[in-house]
Amino acid sequence: SVYSGTKGFVLNFSRGLQQELANTGIRIQVVLPAATATDLWDISGVPLAALAPETVMSVEHLVDAALAGFDQGESVTLPSMADIGLWERYDTARSDLFAAMQTGKPAPRLLAL
């Protein structure tokens, strides 16, 4: 839970920096890799060999993909995701949820008690 919470923090922190630095010429990219062949697996007690090999990306491929995403202007790069539209739809839904919460009053379903 600490690992996934940290990833969530890094994503949101990076998004905040992207907004704050939008017109400064400084670009912030956040990379969200899936399983990557690093020592982290063994350190965490889950041997890399326990993962399906086809789901694990090499560090070299991860770095190349992250740099390609940066060169393409991606603010969020998911190195193993072929259909970036999945992320875009998720991100749009996230933004819509945030906007829908800005009503200043309780939702009607919560007042009908």
Question: What residues fall within each predicted segment?
Answer:
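Short-chain dehydrogenase/reductase
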Residues: 10, 14, 63
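A glycine/serine/threonine-rich, flexible loop-to-helix segment
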Residues: 23, 37-53
